[in-house]
Amino acid sequence: MEYEVLSPWSEVDTSVLTGLTPRLDTLEGKTIGMYGDFMALATKMLHVVEEELTRRYPGIRFSYLQYEEETSEIAKDTAFRPKFEQWLGGVDAVLSFYGSVPSGALFLGYNSALMEQLGKPTVMLTVPRTYPTAIRGCKAKGVPGLRTVQYDVAVDKINSHVTLEEVRTAMATDLPGLTDALVSALT
C-alpha cells in the first residue's frame, strides 16, 4: 500500500492569493466593525479600543459581532454566515480580535482573511505567541499580508478574570498601531 501524507502547515496554493483592500483615508465618520473571537477578553478589548477611538474621532461609529465557535470557519458556517455578511455590509473596516490560544488564532486568521477577501480593510490583533499560527491561517486562505498588530498581554490571568482597567492599561500602548494599520498607506 502507498499513502500520501499531508500536513496542515503545507505550502499555500499561491494561485488564489488576494491583495489587500485599500486602507481608509480617515476614521472620522466611519463605522468600524469590532469582531471578537470566542474569548471573553476579546469583547473587553474591543470596548476599550472603542472608548479610545471615540475620544480621538468623535464621529466614528462601531458595530460588534462575536463568533463564539472556537475552531470553525465562518465561510463554512451556513447558519452564521448570513448574519456575518449582513454585519460586514454595514462597516467600513474591521478590527479582528484576538487569538490568544493557538487553535483560536488559526481560525481568527481564517475568518479575518475572509473579511479582507470580501472587501473590508481588516486588522487582526494577536498575542506574540500565537502570531505565527494566526498568520498561517491568513496564508492558508490566500491573504498572506493581512495587517496584524501584536498585543503582548501584560496580565497573566485566565482571560475572563482580566479587568477592564488592566485591559485599558495594556491597550494604551497598542492603540496607535491599530489606528495606523487602519489608515496608513499600504507599503
Predicted regions and their residues:
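Metallocofactor- and cofactor-centric catalytic cores in central/energy metabolism, strongly enriched
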Residues: M1-L118, T126, Y131-K141, T148-R168, ...
